[in-house]
Amino acid sequence: MQRRHQDRQQYFNELANTSRTSYIDYLKPYLTLTPQTRVLEIGCGEGGNLLPFAEAGCRVKGIDLNDLRIEQAQQFFAAAGLQGLFVNENFITADKPTTEDERFDLILIHDVVEHIEQPYKQDFFSHISPFLKCDGIIFIGFPAWQMPFGGHQQICHGFVSKIPFIHLLPTPLYTSLLKLSGERERDIQELLSIKRSAMTIEHFEQLCRTTGYTLIKKTLWFINPHYEQKFNLKPRRLPKLLGQIPWFRNFYTTSAFYLLKVKR
């Protein structure tokens, strides 16, 4: 396990830096940030992605299942002298807004959809649109399942944390190796849940179509923009030809960015 997964302040700062240098620029042609802009992040963790939006004067809200992460988000924002509303709840069961003023101009969903298991994915996607304003935008980013560390094995403490593609092994063998590596049972269960989720580019785009979203922009990254913070590597897009080959492209896409709107 890398130190950043244990030092949550460092983790928060790195997410904020990537959001500041990459996500806001990615959104600029489609969204002007003002003090009236309402931003919701689903699966916000400690809130690092939201910090630059709060710095720009936006009204930000974060939702997360993990109560500890919500407490940390509140602490980090308070330390930064910024306002943000953070709520510990399950988004799928969250009450839908009833007025346009309660809805959001931007919904961020970053490194979340790969954690949602198959039976719940469609419900999750369908539940997003009621939270979005008529001209609002959704920004979703996720690592393709078959990429070298698409199983999130880097969160492990033992030898498996450094082995690429190990998550693609059959489940019984993968489970045995996780146990041999000395991983905690709760971590093993989390990794097996991600394996059951197995979010590919193709499945994601199918979900978008079936739940009523229109694609505005799509970028497949060979080197994830966040790797600049983690490993000092410059972001690189996946070559266009490679990005057009279904299934095969998942092995090379360390992050996929999508901007979506609701079909009206």
Task: Enumerate the language-model features and the residues they cover.
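Helix-to-beta-strand junctions that scaffold the AdoMet/dcAdoMet cofactor pocket
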Residues: 117, 132-133
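Conserved N-terminal segment of class I S-adenosyl-L-methionine
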Residues: 1-102, 106, 122, 253-257
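Active-site micro-motifs of SAM-dependent methyltransferase domains
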Residues: 93, 114, 147
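Active-site beta-strand termini and strand-to-loop segments that position acidic
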Residues: 260-263
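Surface-exposed loop/turn positions
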Residues: 37, 135-136
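S-adenosyl-L-methionine-dependent methyltransferase catalytic module, highlighting the catalytic core
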Residues: 120-128, 137-258
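A short beta-strand submotif of the Rossmann-like class I SAM-dependent methyltransferase core
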Residues: 109-112
